[in-house]
Amino acid sequence: MKALLDLFKQVQQPEVFDAIKIGLASPDKIRSWSFGEVKKPETINYRTFKPERDGLFCAKIFGPIKDYECLCGKYKRLKHRGVICEKCGVEVTLAKVRRERMGHIELASPVAHIWFLKSLPSRLGMVLDMTLRDIERVLYFEAYVVIDPGMTPLKARQIMTEEDYYNKVEEYGDEFRAEMGAEGVRELLRAINIDEQVEMLRTELKNTGSEAKIKKYAKRLKVLEAFQRSGIKPDWMVLEVLPVLPPELRPLVPLDGGRFATSDLNDLYRRVINRNNRLKRLLELKAPEIIVRNEKRMLQEAVDSLLDNGRRGKAMTGANKRPLKSLADMIKGKGGRFRQNLLGKRVDYSGRSVIVVGPTLKLHQCGLPKLMALELFKPFIFNKLEVMGVATTIKAAKKEVENQTPVVWDILEEVIREHPVMLNRAPTLHRLGIQAFEPVLIEGKAIQLHPLVCAAFNADFDGDQMAVHVPLSLEAQMEARTLMLASNNILFPANGDPSIVPSQDIVLGLYYATREAVNAKGEGLTFTGVSEALRAYENKEVELASRVNVRITEMVHNEDKSDGAPAFVPKISLYATTVGRAILSEILPPGLPFSVLNKPLKKKEISRLINTAFRKCGLRETVIFADQLMQSGFRLATRAGISICVDDMLVPPQKETIVGDAAKKVKEYDRQYMSGLVTSQERYNNVVDIWSATSEAVGKAMMEQLSTEPVTDRDGNETRQESFNSIYMMADSGARGSAVQIRQLAGMRGLMAKPDGSIIETPITANFREGLNVLQYFISTHGARKGLADTALKTANSGYLTRRLVDVTQDLVVVEDDCGTSNGVAMKALVEGGEVVEALRDRILGRVTVADVVNPESQETLYETGTLLDEDAVEEIERLGIDEVRVRTPLTCETRYGLCAACYGRDLGRGSSVNVGEAVGVIAAQSIGEPGTQLTMRTFHIGGAASRAAVASSVEAKSNGTVRFTATMRYVTNAKGEQIVISRSGEAMITDDHGRERERHKVPYGATLLQLDGAQIKAGTQLATWDPMTRPIITEYGGTVKFENVEEGVTVAKQIDDVTGLSTLVVIDVKRRGSQASKTVRPQVKLLDANGEEVKIPNTEHSVQIGFQVGALITVKDGQQVQVGEVLARIPTESQKTRDITGGLPRVAELFEARSPKDAGILAEVTGTTSFGKDTKGKQRLVITDLEGNQHEFLIAKEKQVLVHDGQVVNKGEMIVDGPADPHDILRLQGVEALSRYIVDEVQDVYRLQGVKINDKHIEVIVRQMLRRVQITDNGDTRFIPGEQVERSDMLDENDRMIAEDKRPATYENVLLGITKASLSTDSFISAASFQETTRVLTEAAIMGKRDDLRGLKENVIVGRLIPAGTGLAFHKARKSKELSDRERFDQIAAEESFEFGTPETPAAEQQHSGE
């Protein structure tokens, strides 16, 4: 019987669908869903526990409580399936229909849906063109609204108070109609003729000129067009029928003691039903208007609370005074349906336990506790037991397993063989946080983890726990084995470096074994082979570090490539090496030369070694090699027995004198301050400077002493060798600790910061070895506590950044091999402050070329367009001195939905070209988000110590080569023959013999050039010098000075220098000027030529006028002759405010959110000539006249620093007012490539500061997603509205259609959206709703009748399908093509049938819809 029942409960085939549509339900639709009206607020009878009839749990409406059994018990059993009991009215069927059958409530008075009323911008307001305030007054019965003005002078939609209404009624009688409440609003909505309105708005839009109106009309048009397109009637925003959720979804559970636990929804529904019934009764009794009105208002409020409690007014509360959880609360937020149940679920067949180290495991194995394995693989074991005939039934099998008989353990071994399990450590910040391993059964209760995968999991063994998951199906096991097995994931997807790098003991052991010592035992011996050296070592004839000569056999690549020839051939050579290195040479994989081991192995070296092995010998050899490295490291570290003691921390003897000298200097500054020679701030800055220098000096002295030790060599001479001090070795090898930490142990702790980030000027002169006194200890608690508080904040912030990044990129998948674009970006080495920060080879590695790479010497093509550049290629490019390579980038990829493999290039986690189906968006988001917790949270104040060091006064070349100036460099020659720079953004480059850029330096305005373009120079040559303390104002033309508006006491003041007695004129601040007139003028200089005429700017009618900024010291006199390049005035740089620099995480978030910085710099909108117009109050007016003679004005605050002067020619996009750049301006004026360069470089700066490596392409992928919307400038013949923002792919599809129909396509400009905004504005409403602002997203989608094509990953996870990435992409493609071929077959059969019988064919349209 049970089996029979199960037969009927067979799982229905899941519906196959391509898209999900959302809309507003009409009242008839709601009634059609319903299985009956809920008339009573009763739930269940507390004595019988049976649901009340017509109540919220009524069995007649919602279905039976027990399977195939009616309520009164007349019909039981399967044979009555589908009968409706005549006594209790219940249909005999499965009880689970109570999860899907809905009811409804007929409302006595219509009610407005709060989402469309209150969710901003109010949709009701938009449609009716009324303010939200007015609509609310009407809905909540505070005012009347005119519905039909008739022949009266009243206007439709006019609001009037009750008094007004009665007056008008007296005046006009029943000429006009006005209503209150939702009825009135519904009438208005019904009266709207959408087509008419849309036409009207479109014409208005074309004819109006005011910005505000255009904005308003466009918004309203968008909403109305949405209604028009979706076929949803606006009056459906007012409910007449309220659907009731199926009872199983709002359960009522009896607790012991006769109480019930219930879902809040039941409470909310009860209120609605109570008020509705009361209203019905009042209407039947023809109660006074005021009572009815009050009841209607209460009904409206009850429905509001049910839909979205707390959205308007005070939230309804239950018996325990907490707000009730409404329908809206059920779906939104972290605990809502989307994020709690759809995007993250609890998983069957999983377990978790503490992890311990498993040094004996292979890389692809993990130790699984026996009991855990038994529990996880239970069904498999039951099956095996039945198949083998040990147990006859599942029940018997269960018993066997519970008794843990020997046969069960044998079977477990068998089941587990070749069946990978997945291990996961939370937080899973990148894809290496879940990896598959083959389980090895172990005793105990802890999971054993291989030491080399700890780096990827970020795991340690101080009590970390990990979860185990079992892939059940064969496909899942296959994917786990091929894609997720730990030995297949040995590179970080973020940067392509190996993730299986040894750390701690392993590094220490390898380092110790490969160090060399002077005059160790047996130095200078020669051995015939490694085995002989090993024998000598084991007989204590030599030490590990002894320098010896050994014959070593290496396996090298065979030159003979013929068939049957071995791939590797042995090559024997004698090496001068150490015993330890020779012994290690045994584990070298074939194909790697011994030279890679013939040096002290530090952590970085080992990482490089594994990387080389992977590139040269392939995955399998590398994994084996890494495992052997680990085993050797552990063994050697154990044998070495390195330990530390207090005496290892050597305090340098010079420390006392260094600290003493510093204290003297500080005293001197204190004395100067007391006598008033320096200000308090200067004294503080200097003191901090002194102490940080002292700290450095002590640290340096300590490291010098620690890092070397004296020894006697074989010939009896005293020499020094690298120290074998344990602490030094740990730090030097990279096993543990760093120079900074050693400095605190044995040098001095140095300066500490207060919680607000400012530095305490009293340093801690002691170190941990000497011990801190009470005051010093107290000072250091500050920093420690701030560190802990910061860490907690950082984790949350970093997690939120990752979530936003994943959300914006989740639908970006590689969908084709090549989009065929010819666009790309030019990649150069990244040079900052004259140093190469990132070499060209690192930036183009793994990219596809978009133009031929040409050998500069022979001009022949090295690499064709479309070549994927690998390690050999980039090395060749570097060797030839090519300084710029054009490569493909995700930014310019022309694939519509997704990316192509060529634009992305190499998959960094696999080391080969990226596969179609790779979810590159999510990988990019994880790569940027994962190191987020390592970034700081602080904002740097530049001022004091930091800026002191930053003042440079000259720039010198770091390498030999030729000087080259950029196109923006402009200079004049003054009377002394010196070249004075007059450009603001000029840069000097040094290029080598091949013309490749080696370094690049900014040369500021007013600098004196010492070398000119094309000069051949040696390293160390000065290129330019300048005065760091002042900024000059320089004339580009000669002539006689004529002052304008330079009046003493009005615009300038005379200052007399105390020391020299010379007087200078200083331009005074606007605020300090006396008369009103003098506030608007600007002191400036004009130049006169020999005839007394004003000197004009060449080729223009403008006279030369040079304005003086506030605070400028004027150094020339009226009437003085000046030559070209002479200084007219100087501005002391001290007066510049120190500005905060946002660093760390907040900076990254700021960049990705595309926020405009406050006090942003201003860029020139056009190319043209600058001049200053009439100043307004507190602002100066800068005018740029373009080449056609059109003028563009900028108003600039007086305190801002203008970087241009009168008559200067500026290029479009050039900075004209100093300040941080605004990414939106860069995009508008300089284009996508400049924007991407800006964002990539800025983000990389933050990460580089923390020593984190992230590949550029990940950031480019995010920028692509930030640019995925465009703004329509001219709509042509398309359906778009000018100024509307639309998805780029939509716009391109629409334009393609227009071009195909010979109509005018739309023109557009790029828009940069921050990641939050970009996620919310995605086409998929499911994805947007599950991210943030759920209510707003769903409201908008419902009105527009949006359809979600389920293109992204999130949408598919939510509806429970395979994601369209990886193996899922192929699955979906196959499914779609199968559907197509099925449909074609169906059409063909239909055609044949109709041909035979002469029946008309079904119209194609119907067939199209049947698929949706």
UniProtKB/Swiss-Prot annotation:
Domain of life per record:
Bacteria
- Catalysed reaction, written as an equation: RNA(n) + a ribonucleoside 5'-triphosphate = RNA(n+1) + diphosphate
Question: Where does the secretion signal sit in this chain?
Answer: none
Q: List the disulfide bonds.
A: none
Q: Which GO terms describe its molecular function?
A: DNA binding; DNA-directed RNA polymerase activity; magnesium ion binding; zinc ion binding
UniProt KW keywords: DNA-directed RNA polymerase, Magnesium, Metal-binding, Nucleotidyltransferase, Transcription, Transferase, Zinc
Enzyme Commission identifier(s): 2.7.7.6
According to its UniProt record, this protein's enzyme class is: transferase
Q: Where does Zn(2+) 2 bind?
A: C819, C893, C900, C903
Against CDD domains, the record matches this protein to: RNAP_beta'_C (cd02655), RNAP_beta'_N (cd01609)
Q: Looking at the UniProt record for this protein, which Gene Ontology cellular component terms does it annotate, in alphabetical order?
A: DNA-directed RNA polymerase complex
What is the free-text note on the cofactor?
Binds 1 Mg(2+) ion per subunit. Binds 2 Zn(2+) ions per subunit.
The UniProt annotation puts the region (Disordered) at 1391-1412
UniProt binding sites for Zn(2+) 1 = C70, C72, C85, C88
The protein's required cofactors: Mg(2+); Zn(2+)
Q: Where does Mg(2+) bind?
A: D460, D462, D464
GO process terms (BP): DNA-templated transcription
The Swiss-Prot or TrEMBL record describes its family as follows:
Belongs to the RNA polymerase beta' chain family.
Q: How does it assemble?
A: The RNAP catalytic core consists of 2 alpha, 1 beta, 1 beta' and 1 omega subunit. When a sigma factor is associated with the core the holoenzyme is formed, which can initiate transcription.
Which PANTHER family would you find in this protein's record? DNA-DIRECTED RNA POLYMERASE, DNA-DIRECTED RNA POLYMERASE SUBUNIT BETA
UniProt function note:
DNA-dependent RNA polymerase catalyzes the transcription of DNA into RNA using the four ribonucleoside triphosphates as substrates.
Spell out the protein name for this chain.
DNA-directed RNA polymerase subunit beta'
- The species is Paraburkholderia xenovorans (strain LB400)
